[in-house]
């Protein structure tokens, strides 16, 4: 496979992940399944939903969730720095989410929905440690940010042999937790396979077999092979919230479906709950298989920073470290 094809797949993974996140955000964190079903029963196009159903916060349509925003911060850092530097990444993360930013707003579950973007509590706690220079500043919780935010890192370092180390460094800034790290590393290895090799129905099996044995492999394998369930039912079975392993299992259940980009994102949107990180993951996996042409141009234009992320992704793909 030519390097030009790999570069296009790397670019597609970045854009596909972030556009999917933006397309999903208006219906992020909706846990009332009956309300969700009623809203989408007669809608063939759930993306960029005009009615903001998210009960926790209100924000502009086309913007990124907190998961996509972390993805974007990493993308921007990699391009501007021409590679990963932990100290500079921590500084960029703090500047983007820390004091004086739109994310540094009072938020209380007693006064919902909040007006403006949401910052998860474990990020707030991590920011306090980042300021002190602690390189493992993250909170000890297993959350889906771990895999949802690292697509740009995979795109740059696919095939380089450095991916595991860099993934761990990035994740521990926010989530100093072994399950979070291992989940992100497995997500990265599967995405790396798609970027380097394109579509491969055996990708999951190959990556799983080559992944070090640990207590998490069975959970991932179980979700992937649970093929009798619809994705909606799989998400309900494994957990529609933000925690791991459930959130990642819901994303992994998609892998065997072999759907195109649009169908994949729509399926993920309709699964409800904490669907933005699943959209980040699924959007990256499927776009890396089909290439940049699979992402609808009108979806990119409906993404607030759509043109910017395309430009950043193009620049990053030319800096791939393989």
Curated annotation (Swiss-Prot):
It holds the Pfam family ADP_ribosyl_GH. InterPro entries: ADP-ribosylglycohydrolase, Ribosyl_crysJ1, Ribosyl_crysJ1_sf. Keywords: Eye lens protein. It comes from the Eukaryota. Expressed in the rhopalia. Present in both the large and small eyes. SUPFAM superfamilies: ADP-ribosylglycohydrolase (SSF101478). Disulfide bonds: none annotated. Gene3D superfamilies: ADP-ribosylation/Crystallin J1 (1.10.4080.10). Signal peptide: none annotated. Belongs to the ADP-ribosylglycohydrolase family. J1 crystallin subfamily. This is Crystallin J1C. It comes from Tripedalia cystophora (Jellyfish).
